[in-house]
Amino acid sequence: MESQEKQADFFQIPKSMDYRNRNKKFRKAMAPVHLPLSCYKVPKEAFPPSPECWRVHPSRPNATPCLHLDKKPDLFTHWRTLNEQRKERESKSLFWKRRNFPRYFKDSAQMPNLHVSISKLTLKPKEGPGLLDPTKDPLKWQRLKELTNGLNSPQEDEQCYAAYALGHLGISNKFVMEALWQVAQTGSTKVKNEAYKSLASLGCLDKSVIKAFIKQLMEHKESQRLETLVGLRVALNSWAAMPKNKKPEVPYEEKLVLLLQNLIYKPLNEESLEAALCLGFLRPSNSIVQQFLLQCLSKGSMSQRMKALRMLVKMMNVHSAAVTRAILEQLHSNVIDDRLEATQMLKTVGLEKIQAQGLVKLTFDLLKRKMYSEPFQVIRQAVSETVDVLKMKPLIMKLMEAQLMSPDVSDRQEAIISLGALGIRNEKVFHLLLDMLDAEETKSVKKSIQETLLVWASRNPWIQNKLTNKVFFVYDIPKAVKTEHTRFRKKPESPDDLCITDFRRAKLNPLFITKAYNKLGEKLEAPAFSFYFSKPKKQRPQATGPWEPKIREQLRNMVLPQNRFLFWL
């Protein structure tokens, strides 16, 4: 009876105790806990593993050999073991992601600047006037507000400066244009002139603006007239860059053209050149302007010639022999932007016109010389792009590769620098440079080889992988440095100042350029082999006779009382 009462009590348990996933949690709580195996039950591993573990699977013949173990130890349910396995899987996946992703020199500060894309090498024209969003650039918006308030200043100089600055900022918001118009109507003569210039540069070629320009050109002195012409040229430049369907008509154009032609007939100077440029925007096919600009190519200064070339090549499409010769002369300009723009103009002229003019040999020799005489890598790369467009690159590369074997040091160095900009065609040249790096005795040539290899590696992943563990030595002139105590030595601020004497203790980044440091009076040479290889051991004479008696004698000596303490060390 008692057992029946207990069963009845058990079945009378209210159903409110049954909750969701109760059985699952009960099963989980009653499951046995598998602790890590003891040291006696852990499966043993054989070292070294058999060669079978390192063989490549037939389905992946090109895969990198790695260790494959079929027998894996039992998985433990202990949370620490599971956490370690998860971290190991994540590290493996991260490793393969990095392996598949192309390696770039992220640790080196100089590598990203070695190779520049051609889109960055092209000089883009300045953007025309536009609107400004106050949310994107609040500081510039605040500057605009301050300048517009400066137009209402009681001092004339502040008003002139505000009008001048608003024109150069190139922002044509409504409140800016209204403030400039108000000052142009109510201000003094000096302020009016600056306001009209700013309005013209912001794209407002109204009747009153052009009328004010004509008045200034007729009345002002030469210095003030030059400033007016420069402002008019800037306004007409932005006007000429507009699409034809959106380009407005210039009021009083005929009167302005006649006035500019009268200024051209004067002797060649900055004023007449600016007038010719303004007239070139209004009348691109005017023969008078073309003759004046062609005359400027032979008589003017380098900066004046460059201004004339821009108008002739880009606006008037004049590609004569005189223009080509002037472009080649601009490759020797002291201004880096002019040299860069000259390479682009040669691409605009094209190979066919250069051949028709009979200037192929002159162009070839000059571009070939510019490949190694140019001090900046960016310009050398731009020259390489121009040589490629003009279909001269294969011949120049062939000549430079043959010049690598020249006995003259300067010829070898010129070829190495040129190939750094031209690139590499086959592996033989790469291996030849590596051999030259080891065999070359001239330090300047060695440095050029190192720079060429670094430039190649910055744009060629194959060369980059080949040079990953390569360490370059840059030799410096020995300096008399007072040795200090290790405790008081200053840490080098940059890796270039680091002096590595023992590479076994140094963490080498890819293509890390180290400096070989030597004392006065000592000659330091690069080691013949890397420190990562073990040093060859001294050859010992082979043991003769039976070896068992010798071992027994050593064991007997170890058991002696005076040597018994050795076992406890």
UniProtKB/Swiss-Prot annotation:
Coiled-coil region: none
Any Gene Ontology biological process: hematopoietic progenitor cell differentiation
Domain of life: Eukaryota
Gene3D superfamilies (UniProt xref): Leucine-rich Repeat Variant
InterPro entries listed in its UniProt record: ARM-like, ARM-type_fold, HEATR9
Name under which the protein is recorded: Protein HEATR9
Organism: Mus musculus
Protein encoded by which gene: Heatr9
